[in-house]
């Protein structure tokens, strides 16, 4: 029985409700009165139910599609302006006991070189990331109780936060590790993590169990209920996502939105972020073995509808996607991207030898962080290295309240400009610096609150003189 407030996986992600929704969408997708009513609701920035969103996904009218794309861009700018948050993944270890058939880290893969970073190696990786200009990391590790216990993760977080190299500092560590206990989530909270991220992979229980034949991850309920335990452990900000291509896209699209609705209904705050990775090639993984690949046109539509259905959430796209695709996705609601990424263990300090194969997936966007920042500036996006909300305690429902009532721009715009200024001063190429300085000068006047605008101008001058780490 479907119950969005239940904490039982098969009740808040109810297979019969998903299938009923898919049937409803197929039946009513050509009802233009209904479709335009749904678009009007989205245009009022009220979000959409999973059933309403499914109707839009199923509707193949070109004019409706164009309205969806235009509206996604409008919604993104309403809540997040033209800011794009920058981050990088940091892979600590690829030791893993699970048998996920779509991931090269699976325990039976003998061709991959297993690696685990020591604390000194983590220090070197973090310095390399700081020297690029990064301030926000997404920490990644395989699931292995002996090689990657929670104590190793906690020690690594402490190490990362402790490193201050030149003007560099990692100010927010997000964590993407396997589902764990309420007590361990409390320990992660106490370690000062930002967002806890866990991808569902697929919401189809039968398919999930087939794709995860061995290891602790094979337990569908344990994995699917992880965000509930994280919330119960005091983690305010959680990030969800599916790996599109493992299941029919319509099924996982509906399941993903139901998960967001469940968190909002049960805890009063929905997902801080939604990620939309697509299955891609990796060592010992051939995408031809999976029949549910999502073509670009459908993928773009999925991203756009998620944006209008869950308008408050941050939406993330990684270097799995090419520069060309990422440019299109920025127009459809994406608000966070990675740049200069390495998906191998230890890949920031030393370029991996071809025979090592320690990467989780092959990246499609190989540009440096400076090239990505320059590209964003050329597209009139603000590359933001801001971590202020997390550090000021604006998390969970406090962040969402500010976001939904439109007050966040008095914080986010000046913070974005100040962190961009830091990047330009410390790390940017001359061409990027010139573009960025022109943007800061132009956009400072857009800070809505006069006092905040004056204070931001003062802080920008002080950054020019060598001071760092101002925030609203």
Regions found by a protein language model. Name each.
Residues 1-37, 41, 327-335, 341-472:
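Radical SAM enzyme core and accessory elements
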Residues 80-121:
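Canonical Radical SAM [4Fe-4S] cluster-binding loop centered on the CxxxCxxC motif
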